[in-house]
From Swiss-Prot:
A biological-process GO annotation: translation
Region (Disordered): 96-125
Composition-biased stretches (Acidic residues): 116-125
Database matches in InterPro entries: Ribosomal_bS6 (IPR000529), Ribosomal_bS6_CS (IPR020815), Ribosomal_bS6_sf (IPR035980), Ribosomal_S6_plastid/chlpt (IPR020814), Transl_elong_EF1B/ribsomal_bS6 (IPR014717)
Protein name, per record: Small ribosomal subunit protein bS6
Superkingdom assignment: Bacteria
GO MF terms held by the record: small ribosomal subunit rRNA binding; structural constituent of ribosome
Protein encoded by which gene: rpsF
UniProt xrefs under CDD domains: bS6 (cd00473)
Similarity annotation: Belongs to the bacterial ribosomal protein bS6 family.
Gene Ontology CC terms, in alphabetical order: cytosolic small ribosomal subunit
Function, in words: Binds together with bS18 to 16S ribosomal RNA.
Pfam family, one: Ribosomal_S6
Organism: Haemophilus influenzae (strain ATCC 51907 / DSM 11121 / KW20 / Rd)
UniProt PTM comment: Modified post-translationally by the addition of C-terminal Glu residues by the RIMK enzyme.
Amino acid sequence: MRHYEIVFMVHPDQSEQVPGMIERYTGSVKEAGGQVHRLEDWGRRQLAYPINKLHKAHYVLMNVEAPQQVIDELETTFRYNDAVLRSLVIHTKHAVTEASPMKAAKEERKPLAEVENNDFEDAEE
């Protein structure tokens, strides 16, 4: 089986459907004997340029190991699902399990906010 990186962008009005979509897509990969190595829901983000007069979209990143038949099925599903604005499937040489730069940057910012909050509590005492 080959390794793939899949990114798809969902219409912002359909954000509540994203968890169901993720479950459906990962389920089809696992049913075919594949594995999901990385799954990141980046949430709503600003688009670089408008798509269908929209300026935001809900982003999802998946790194999977799956047979070609499942990938073809996913691409067809993306193509005919009106909620999916754009999708990209890339073949990779090996499994990617570490956090993406988007996720790593988000995690680096969280502790900074907690540190500032702790400094504020110390100043009150």
